[in-house]
Amino acid sequence: MTNSISVIELQQKIDNQEDFMLIDVRESFEREHFNIGGLHISMQTVFDRVNEIPKEKIVVLYCQKGIRSMIVIQRLSERYGYQNLINLQGGMDAWLKMKTQ
């Protein structure tokens, strides 16, 4: 089971300046349209760049809808033993919806 965080909880982490890492697993063209920051490691390159993903701090991964980031988390957990990865529920779609309300 993948750990997840809501957009409201993520906003609170950002506001409280908590120590965590943010990773966008979308493609470059999606990120250019809109992003909330963090390191960009597309789903296609994540295993080539696994050494950039720490195991000693919380890492929140996001994509457009929360599906690709969930898949990446499952694969990283299975292959490399990560236990510190959290999926942003609803991804950028949920983030944009929250910001427009």
Per-region residue spans from a language model:
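Rhodanese-like catalytic fold shared by cysteine-dependent sulfurtransferases
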Residues: M1-M21, V25-V60, K65-Q101
